[in-house]
Amino acid sequence: MSTYAYRQAAGIRQALLDRRELALIDVREEADFATAHPLFAVNLPLSKLELEVRRRIPRFTTPLTVYDNGEGLAEIAIERLRSWGYQDVALLAEGLAGWRRSGGELFQDVNSASKAFSELVESVRHTPSLSAQEVQALIDSRQEVVIVDARRFDEYQTMSIPGSISVPGGELALRVESLTPSPQTPVIVNCAGRTRSIIGTQSLINAGVPNPVHALRNGTIGWTLAGQTLAHQQQRQYDPSARASGARAAEVAHFAERAGVAVIDEATLQRWQQQSDRTTFLFDVRSPEEYAAGHYPGSLSAPGGQLVQETDHFASVRGARIVLLDDDGIRAAITGSWLAQMGWETARLSALSTSQLSERGVPAAEVPPGPQAEEISPTQLAQQLEEPGTVVLDFTTSANFVARHIPGAWWLTRSQLRQALEAIPPAQRYVVTCGSSLLARYAVPEVAALTGKPVQLLTGGTLAWIAAGLPLAHGDSGLAVERRDRYRRPYEGTDNSAQAMQAYLEWEYGLVDQLARDGTHGFRVL
């Protein structure tokens, strides 16, 4: 019988204050994680742990503390982590309840540390903002105004402020000069809620942009609650060839230096990467398209705005070292200035030449070896489904499943496998799939153990089924368990209730007080 080490909540909090490396891992599904978690907890659901852990926690000797809320998932996760080579793995004593009983603060939503930091920035710097009504009046006045949307382009396409241009947050300091006709032109920065517009606005102010800059207070949520109309499916983007002036680059570099961002050479980077007792993340903060066209060997794509907004998703080891790179001297500096203020040891790689960006494409995820499995092709499966006795189990995301799936398939997660199988009619054999069948492969022995029936793996996954031109079904009729794999964000999509949007804003406004109660954040706003 396995034995487990335990770490107390008080010890975790002290390690955070001491800036020692640690990863505090919540292995529940994202929707459960979003109900309550410690500030620096990272969500690595047991159901897809294999796909993410090596990217997010690359060093095998990092101290890992795993918890759930009494579901029994943490113990399974520890066994798997040990089997993959992680050497310092422990359970959080009494799990989430133990953290709460010890007096630890609990946060809701996702990316809570980044969002709380953004609210602290506004509180300290008094970041200027305008209400939805004030921005609408500015538009109606026919005065020249530039509205930039700091979210990802796909979010911008879903809904946007009329007349706005997509400029993801990490690109703002580099691109905004090319979008403003004069230094007097007002610039409005928006996101869906509050935090990305706060950081985007303050980034431009910190970069010394001469234009009057304001955040759209409460973003598209505030715009909607004011009864104003959003645009949809817009395509306006910045010119990717646009660059900032030399003066702007110098201003940004100076601010990054003030924040504590070091400038290092390749030799220093290599020395850091060879240290066995420290984690060094190397992130390329340019756009995903630029990264795919050519990037520095070993770097990971992390567009600057997303890295600041979703730091826990990219760098899941608090206390680790973060090195950033770009090819312009601005994006890494402005991104690094925020990470340094968030308490990360941050550096940027000195100017790189095009020849050094020698790797192409997006590297495949590093995952543990998958179990052996009998495979079945899409055409063979289609023939097999013509006769009774075969049930298809789909381990993709619930959103993907609802959008399209193999007719008759059931959706489930590995963390709720036993419960799901009880809800699914028994079969003579099972076929498992997901988008590519990468994740589904790990489920083969688990399904076999619980059912005692033959289990096959769909070669190439549902994508191969689609490529073969085979029929597809849509909708949620095949959900074997509740959709808990993704938290429904009140700031995404166009069908959120006014009550949910207002509650989200009120939660954001309360984050600064939560930070004060928590006391472990280490944030320092310049």
Residue ranges and their predicted role:
Residues 1-23, 27-146, 150-281, 285-391, ...:
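Rhodanese-like catalytic fold shared by cysteine-dependent sulfurtransferases
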